[in-house]
Amino acid sequence: MTNKIVAIQGDIPSKLNPETDTSIFLANEIQNKRYKIFYYEPKNLSIINSKVVAKGCFITINYHKKKFYKILKKKSLELVKSKFILIRQNPPFNLEYISTTYILDLIKTKVKIINDPTSIRSISEKLYSSRFQKYMPNTIFTQNINEIKAFFKKNKKVILKPIHGYSGNDIHLLTRFKSNLIKRFVKKNGHIMCQKFLPKISNGDKRVFVINGKLFGVISRIPKKGSFLSNMSKGAKVINTKLTKVERQISNLIAKDLKKENIFFAGIDFIDQKLNGDINVTSPTGIKTYYDLSGKNLAKTFWKELKA
């Protein structure tokens, strides 16, 4: 019989904010079902004698204490002994990240892994959105400077994003063409995403939560004054909201495709009823904040859909 263990591959717990962190929220919920929580960092994942092993620690979560987690025991765990593995480390989606998906591929027929490591690897979050480009503002993916220049000339205000970035890091708003900046940006990132700027971002974006191919909630994130970044990590204010008919139709279409691609948990982002190209499948976040705003516990939904 499989042990009641949930292994979480994530960033070091001491760097997480329990007030907003989704991984901790999910861990706390499954802990209430008497599962043990084993936490490890990606760098501590190995293949030893043909076995997938992680060095980490068993922890308990307690939201009522200043230090929200307690280390019970440090251990090397053969991960097939767990019932679920959650891939929860933040991007960048680099070779180190990709390597962990190949390692976890070796045991995914024996342990339920969320999200499926093969699917994470094959779905580049921003490039995947190009399947639904008719629902997006004008967008190109390129590293050709002349293409970027022509795109800027047509659209006047343009957002530049690294394809494999996260949390609003290294995003630029171009109001005039800056050749040197773009050359440096392309040299650093290779292919980049260029998108027509949507001024209504000042009213906030929307993050839709997708679990097992279904829509389960939405929040709006409003950039702080003087910013165009709606990420919570960049100081955005989060409020309750609802989806429009158009947003719901697009979200259901994407959710259906995500389920077909074996993506269990995802976040879809909109600005002004347009898909902004961020479909988060690596480490979707926001459900703790959604719970604080609405009282609806999507961590319970998550585990219920997994039949934990």
Regions found by a protein language model. Give the residues of each.
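Extreme N-terminal starter segment of soluble prokaryotic enzymes
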Residues: 2-7
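Redox-cofactor binding/interface segments in oxidoreductases and associated redox assembly factors
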Residues: 8, 86-87, 195
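ATP-dependent carboxylate activation and anion-phosphoryl transfer catalytic cores
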Residues: 10, 15-19, 242-308
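Short glycine-rich anion-binding loops that position phosphate/pyrophosphate groups of nucleotides
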Residues: 12, 89-92, 163-165, 284
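Conserved N-proximal alpha/beta basic substrate-recognition cap immediately N-terminal to
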Residues: 14-141
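Short acidic-glycine loop/turn motifs at beta-strand connectors
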Residues: 34, 46, 175, 210-215, ...
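Short glycine-enriched loops at secondary-structure junctions
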Residues: 117-121, 221-224, 271-275
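Phosphate-binding site of ATP-dependent enzymes
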Residues: 145-146, 153-157, 164-250, 254, ...
